[in-house]
């Protein structure tokens, strides 16, 4: 397969450059906000549209700060400790989903404590929305030619411009499909068909379990981060960080209570 060599920069005006990567965050947040509002309109949960509007600022800060610090601390601490100013260069890429997820969880906790809202009631609204951002983010990773997969002889192999010119799995597209499209459909089906919002924590648990399973499986095709490599000979950082999500998701489903 031929890699579609797309310019990572959409357009630039003087020193200001707009990239597909940054656009994926903006569009993901806007589409997520729209979709969450539709869910609130239909099911009338404890969370109101006004609550959601107020939470957006918390969520954006949680995503950016958590995602960036997660990448810095978990994937490449030596580089950023040597050059702390590089931490601010988010336009170069380098965001961790697990860090971003933790950032949003902390933001949601602080928001719920301030406004006296049930924490799981908020995360159950967030869960069906997240796959939208995951899909767009992985497509942006693909356009950037980063986070590509392992070497393969299969017909799916692509030669990425920033790699060693060996055909590799387009693992970004695998993640976009499973963690984005498939997970979105699973949660939409659960939310609208099985009315999972009637039980605190059920949507959150479903998201955590399926994301973790998809991530663990797709990491088999994804090249480990060069600065980390394999852990315990065969595991990747993404797989290890997904195990707590799997356990927490199982707990939330088992403990989910009717509202």
From Swiss-Prot:
Transmembrane regions: 9-29, 55-75, 92-112, 117-137, 172-192, 201-221, 228-248
PROSITE patterns named among the record's database cross-references:
LGT (PS01311)
Membrane topology per the entry is: Multi-pass membrane protein
UniProt keyword tRNA processing present = no
Query: Where is this chain primarily localised?
Result: membrane
A GO-annotated cellular component: plasma membrane
Superkingdom classification of source: Bacteria
The positions making up the signal sequence are: none
Recorded hits in InterPro entries, A to Z, give:
Lgt
> Per the record, a Pfam family?
LGT
Any one Gene Ontology BP term: lipoprotein biosynthetic process
Alphabetized, the UniProt keywords read:
Cell inner membrane, Cell membrane, Membrane, Transferase, Transmembrane, Transmembrane helix
The EC designation for this entry is: 2.5.1.145
Residues binding a 1,2-diacyl-sn-glycero-3-phospho-(1'-sn-glycerol): 138
Lipid metabolism keyword on record: no
GO MF terms listed in the record are: phosphatidylglycerol-prolipoprotein diacylglyceryl transferase activity
Where in the cell does this protein reside?
Cell inner membrane
User: By its UniProt entry, which NCBIfam families does this protein fall under?
Assistant: lgt
Which PANTHER family does the annotation name? PHOSPHATIDYLGLYCEROL--PROLIPOPROTEIN DIACYLGLYCERYL TRANSFERASE, PROLIPOPROTEIN DIACYLGLYCERYL TRANSFERASE
Its biological purpose is as follows: Catalyzes the transfer of the diacylglyceryl group from phosphatidylglycerol to the sulfhydryl group of the N-terminal cysteine of a prolipoprotein, the first step in the formation of mature lipoproteins.
Q: What is this protein called?
A: Phosphatidylglycerol--prolipoprotein diacylglyceryl transferase
Q: Which organism is it from?
A: Rickettsia felis (strain ATCC VR-1525 / URRWXCal2)
**Gene (UniProt):** lgt
């Amino acid at each position: 397969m031929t890699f579609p060599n797309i310019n990572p920069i959409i357009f630039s005006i003087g020193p200001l450059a707009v990239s597909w990567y940054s656009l994926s965050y903006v569009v993901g947040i806007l589409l997520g906000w729209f979709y969450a509002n539709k869910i609130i309109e239909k099911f009338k949960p404890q969370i109101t549209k006004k609550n959601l509007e107020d939470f957006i600022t918390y969520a954006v800060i949680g995503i950016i700060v958590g995602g960036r610090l997660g990448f810095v601390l978990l994937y490449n601490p030596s580089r950023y400790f040597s050059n702390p100013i590089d931490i601010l260069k988010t336009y170069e890429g380098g965001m961790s989903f697990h860090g971003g997820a933790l950032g949003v969880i902390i933001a949601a906790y602080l928001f719920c404590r301030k406004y006296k809202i049930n924490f799981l009631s908020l995360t159950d609204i967030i869960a069906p929305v997240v796959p939208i951002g995951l899909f767009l983010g992985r497509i942006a990773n693909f356009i950037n030619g980063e986070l590509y997969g392992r070497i393969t002889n299969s017909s799916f192999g692509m030669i990425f411009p920033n790699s060693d010119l060996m055909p590799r799995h387009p693992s970004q597209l695998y993640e976009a499909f499973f963690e984005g499209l498939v997970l979105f459909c699973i949660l939409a089906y659960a939310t609208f068909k099985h009315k999972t919002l009637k039980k605190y924590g059920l949507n959150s648990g479903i998201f955590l379990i399926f994301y973790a399973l998809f991530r663990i499986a797709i990491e088999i095709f994804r090249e480990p981060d060069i600065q980390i490599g394999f852990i315990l000979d065969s595991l990747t950082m993404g797989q290890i960080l997904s195990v707590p999500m799997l356990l927490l998701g199982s707990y939330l489903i088992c403990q989910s209570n009717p509202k």
